[in-house]
């Protein structure tokens, strides 16, 4: 009896094998269109409004920073008892940056080095302190992690497409503005959508902790905000058809368009996003120093060179660098 069963199993196996071998075509193909596409880790739909401190942001001019104190000290000779001297003595500037935003802060896949407009700014600060633009320890921070990294003293500066807002000024200081971006919309090429108002009931992606996600959530058309940890997660969700659009700064969206010609920016800018360098609240001396570095970077043509290198490839003409505004 056992022998009969064994030979039946053998015959069944033979039939199964011949089903594949037959005329050379595989059988029983899995229905690949039904495979579920993975959602980026941490993606959240309709997130609760950010907890934050409940007090409203005080009225302020978020673009106004602290005036530099005269000429910059020579590199390698930071004045005693200053934040800059402590950084010089440590031997490295510690900078919070992004590694997922092509053109501003991204990892070059062939060299593994961090590159982009924001990374160039970090190197200018290091050059002013040490005379060497490479004396930097980069720490990758998410949009949502920027303020905490500064408050906990994990980094000396955050240079990460960060909009200076009155709400953020409550917790940290900002340098003068080094770039002015604006929020726009990214959609599939061929889409008719040109504004957030047309996306009622649809999913729109932005990073957690960004000004962009708040603007999406506040739109009266009642969109479904989808928040993720990294901008590259939004790009993937749009490419996989999991969201109808991405909406954030035109700078970040330009980097996505450069990576995927099937996408396009639609409609005009609908916010102003002035970028400042984040600095811990206590380090006003560092803010003044960094503002001196920004003036030098703009005046000696370094800003324009960096703009041409990273944003020149996105078309359009180079804007004038922002004019610094100070509090006094
Ligand atoms: N500039 C916006 C912000 O600071 C969006 C960019 C980002 O989060 O990286 O929130």
Label for each model-derived stretch:
Residues 32-158:
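Extracytoplasmic small-molecule ligand-binding "clamshell" domains
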Residues 43-78, 210, 277-315:
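Extended ligand-binding regions for polar small-molecule ligands
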Residues 179-187, 254-291, 314-328:
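Periplasmic-binding protein-like
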Residues 14-19:
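C-terminal motif of bacterial Sec signal peptides marking the signal peptidase cleavage site
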Residues 127, 134-198:
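Acidic, polar ligand-binding/catalytic clefts
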Residues 102, 114-129, 162-165, 181-235, ...:
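Bilobed "Venus flytrap"/periplasmic-binding protein-like clamshell domains
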């Amino acid at each position: 009896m056992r022998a009969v069963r064994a030979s039946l199993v053998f015959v069944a196996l033979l039939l199964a094998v011949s089903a594949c071998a037959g005329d050379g075509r595989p059988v029983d193909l899995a229905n690949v269109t039904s495979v579920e596409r993975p959602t980026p880790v941490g993606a959240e739909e309709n997130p609760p409004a950010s907890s934050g401190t409940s007090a409203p942001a005080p009225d302020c001019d978020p673009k106004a920073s602290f005036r530099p104190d005269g000429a910059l000290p020579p590199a390698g000779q930071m004045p005693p008892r200053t934040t800059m001297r402590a950084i010089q003595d440590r031997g490295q500037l510690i900078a919070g940056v992004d590694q997922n935003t092509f053109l501003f802060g991204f990892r070059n896949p062939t060299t593994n080095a961090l590159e982009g407009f924001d990374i160039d700014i970090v190197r200018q600060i290091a050059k002013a302190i040490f005379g060497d633009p490479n004396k930097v320890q980069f720490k990758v921070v998410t949009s949502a992690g920027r303020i905490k990294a500064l408050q906990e003293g994990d980094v000396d500066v955050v240079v990460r497409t960060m909009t200076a807002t009155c709400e953020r000024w409550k917790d940290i200081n900002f340098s003068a503005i080094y770039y002015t971006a604006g929020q726009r919309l990214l959609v599939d090429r061929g889409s008719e959508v040109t504004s957030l108002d047309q996306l009622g009931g649809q999913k729109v992606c932005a990073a957690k902790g960004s000004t962009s996600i708040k603007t999406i959530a506040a739109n009266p058309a009642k969109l479904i905000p989808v928040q993720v940890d990294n901008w590259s997660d939004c790009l993937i969700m749009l490419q996989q058809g999991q969201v109808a659009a991405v909406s954030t700064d035109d700078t970040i969206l330009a980097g996505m368009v450069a990576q995927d010609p099937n996408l396009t920016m639609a409609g005009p800018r609908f916010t102003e996003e002035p970028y400042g360098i984040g600095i811990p609240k206590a380090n006003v001396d560092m803010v003044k120093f960094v503002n001196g570095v920004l003036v030098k970077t703009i005046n000696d043509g370094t800003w324009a060179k960096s703009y041409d290198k990273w944003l020149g490839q996105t078309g359009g003409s180079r804007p004038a660098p922002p004019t610094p505004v100070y509090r006094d």
